[in-house]
Amino acid sequence: MYQSHEFYLRRAIEISKEAREAGNTPFGALLVNKEGEIIMEQGNIEITEKICTGHAEATLAARASHEYSREFLWDCTLYTTAEPCAMCAGAVSYTHLRAHETELH
């Protein structure tokens, strides 16, 4: 069942807090399928994993593209705690995610 954008964004904020508590920069992302189910979550991992591209959005995009087809991802929505940087925006674009939300309204 689909929840409000606020629900998903608040969960993304919680993921960012978890990333910070783990020693990373506080960013989070999650992927929601067309039925409204959260199917993937990711916090930043660039510090603890020593991966310079370990931003939440890019890492989630890479994981999602390995696990799901482009057609499936087209109907998914990415929620993030901030507007993606250029690297992450490119990764999201190549993953063929239909949309992303970054703001509470």
Model-based region annotation:
Residues T81-Y94:
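Local cysteine-cluster metal-coordination motifs and their immediate loop/turn environment
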Residues F72-A82:
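Immediate flanking context of iron-sulfur cluster ligation sites
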Residues T95-L104:
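Conserved small/polar residues in nucleotide/adenosyl-binding loops
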Residues I39-E46:
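Short beta->alpha transition motifs characteristic of CBS
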Residues Y2-E21:
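Short, basic/aromatic recognition patches
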Residues F27-V32:
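Short beta-strand scaffold segments in enzyme catalytic cores
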Residues T48-A58:
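A short, polar/charged loop-to-alpha-helix boundary motif
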